[in-house]
Amino acid sequence: MKDRLFVISQYVLPHHLISRLAGCLAECRLPWVKNTFIKWFVRHFQVDMREAQIEEPTAYEHFNAFFTRALKDGARPLDSTPGAILNPCDGAISQLGKIEQGRIFQAKGHSFSAMELLGGDHERAAPFMGGAFATVYLSPKDYHRVHMPVSGTLREMVYVPGRIFSVNTVTAQGVPELFARNERVVCLFDTEHGPMAMVLVGAMIVASIETVWAGLVTPPKRSLKTFRYDEAARAPIHLEKGAEMGRFKLGSTVILLFGPDRVRWAEQLGPLSPVCMGESLGQAAITAAASEAIELQ
């Protein structure tokens, strides 16, 4: 009953208003406000400050600076196995598997459209049909910067407006098409393993999503926006494996998509498996160059 009431509340709460108010609080620089908030957060969520570059909670200029804190060098070593697909962030696996009949598994009894997740464009979604997906949920205590699982060159970024339901286990089980309904930023890369999509999904209390190349992408612009990065007028944006690509100012979810027969997820990973950025999420099955060579034979 408690879970059902929580799901029902998600439909009636003013999501964007709550998130924008939270964003204002998170940017407050008044010492007594931000220090009280940060210290409560560290204590309540048991945040390990020993791995942060700045260990003293009150040394941050505001809550958002604390929340997107950098870690000490070496805190997240990158798996050096050839062909390893890295976890893009800290968190827990929500789901991972195969994209079947154009749909991505969300929770028992629920799935969502890969095409809708990517902004409703058939051509954009086509390379991922029959491919692989991994959904990683970032809890409040986690490190909230997002990194590249493989090296890639940015081709397109799409801001997709939407609701901002919470994205915990309860709502995943109770809100149909959750991740394809929430506000999100879709980033498409060309990699040696073929096309890769990284989708940063917003949620209630997520005040904003940023990328390293565009800065602030949300709060909402109320309409779908597409930004091309493969045009002659723009300098190519290439990010190396393990490099930061974006961050959440208050938590949420990252969804990775690869094309068919490109990656194999690690067998030991499943729903609720804890993960850290830089660990192996899986292994590349075949490189794009090798695939093209096979097709030419």
From Swiss-Prot:
<keyword id="KW-0670">Pyruvate</keyword>
<dbReference type="InterPro" id="IPR033177">
    <property type="entry name" value="PSD-B"/>
</dbReference>
<keyword id="KW-0444">Lipid biosynthesis</keyword>
<comment type="pathway">
    <text>Phospholipid metabolism; phosphatidylethanolamine biosynthesis; phosphatidylethanolamine from CDP-diacylglycerol: step 2/2.</text>
</comment>
<dbReference type="GO" id="GO:0004609">
    <property type="term" value="F:phosphatidylserine decarboxylase activity"/>
</dbReference>
<comment type="function">
    <text>Catalyzes the formation of phosphatidylethanolamine (PtdEtn) from phosphatidylserine (PtdSer).</text>
</comment>
<keyword id="KW-0210">Decarboxylase</keyword>
<keyword id="KW-0443">Lipid metabolism</keyword>
<dbReference type="GO" id="GO:0005886">
    <property type="term" value="C:plasma membrane"/>
</dbReference>
<feature type="site" description="Cleavage (non-hydrolytic); by autocatalysis">
    <location>
        <begin position="251"/>
        <end position="252"/>
    </location>
</feature>
<keyword id="KW-0594">Phospholipid biosynthesis</keyword>
<dbReference type="InterPro" id="IPR003817">
    <property type="entry name" value="PS_Dcarbxylase"/>
</dbReference>
<feature type="modified residue" description="Pyruvic acid (Ser); by autocatalysis">
    <location>
        <position position="252"/>
    </location>
</feature>
<dbReference type="GO" id="GO:0006646">
    <property type="term" value="P:phosphatidylethanolamine biosynthetic process"/>
</dbReference>
<keyword id="KW-1208">Phospholipid metabolism</keyword>
<dbReference type="Pfam" id="PF02666">
    <property type="entry name" value="PS_Dcarbxylase"/>
</dbReference>
<feature type="active site" description="Schiff-base intermediate with substrate; via pyruvic acid; for decarboxylase activity">
    <location>
        <position position="252"/>
    </location>
</feature>
<comment type="similarity">
    <text>Belongs to the phosphatidylserine decarboxylase family. PSD-B subfamily. Prokaryotic type I sub-subfamily.</text>
</comment>
<feature type="active site" description="Charge relay system; for autoendoproteolytic cleavage activity">
    <location>
        <position position="90"/>
    </location>
</feature>
<keyword id="KW-0456">Lyase</keyword>
<keyword id="KW-1003">Cell membrane</keyword>
<keyword id="KW-0472">Membrane</keyword>
<keyword id="KW-0865">Zymogen</keyword>
<feature type="active site" description="Charge relay system; for autoendoproteolytic cleavage activity">
    <location>
        <position position="147"/>
    </location>
</feature>
<protein>
    <recommendedName>
        <fullName>Phosphatidylserine decarboxylase proenzyme</fullName>
        <ecNumber>4.1.1.65</ecNumber>
    </recommendedName>
</protein>
<comment type="subunit">
    <text>Heterodimer of a large membrane-associated beta subunit and a small pyruvoyl-containing alpha subunit.</text>
</comment>
<dbReference type="InterPro" id="IPR033178">
    <property type="entry name" value="PSD_type1_pro"/>
</dbReference>
<feature type="active site" description="Charge relay system; for autoendoproteolytic cleavage activity">
    <location>
        <position position="252"/>
    </location>
</feature>
